[in-house]
Curated annotation (Swiss-Prot):
Antiparallel homodimer; disulfide-linked. Interaction with LMBR1L is controversial. Signal peptide: none annotated. It comes from Macaca fuscata fuscata (Japanese macaque). Binds phosphatidylcholine, phosphatidylinositol, polychlorinated biphenyls (PCB) and weakly progesterone, potent inhibitor of phospholipase A2. Keywords: Disulfide bond, Phospholipase A2 inhibitor, Secreted. Club cells (nonciliated cells of the surface epithelium of the pulmonary airways). The keyword Secreted applies. This is Uteroglobin. Coiled coil: none annotated.
Length: 70
């Protein structure tokens, strides 16, 4: 089973502001390199069109609900 807080971080990565994503990551006490890498990933994802981000989220939901994950 996937940690619900981890799922919240992933949701924040795709849907929230950079500061909200940083706060969500903070629960896991990342070191500076991890925080910087997360911020870079957020910047890259924010450049994707909304349709692409929505499709990625739908794919992750489909994977999570598939028989291969249950």
């Amino acid at each position: 089973e996937i940690c619900p807080t981890f799922l919240r971080v992933i949701e924040s990565l795709f849907l929230d502001t950079p500061s909200s994503f940083e706060a969500a990551m903070g629960f896991f006490s990342p070191d500076q390199d991890m925080s910087e890498a997360g911020a870079q990933l957020k910047k890259v994802l924010d450049t994707l069109p909304a349709k692409a981000r929505d499709s990625i989220i739908k794919l992750m939901e489909k994977i999570d609900k598939s028989l291969l994950c249950n």
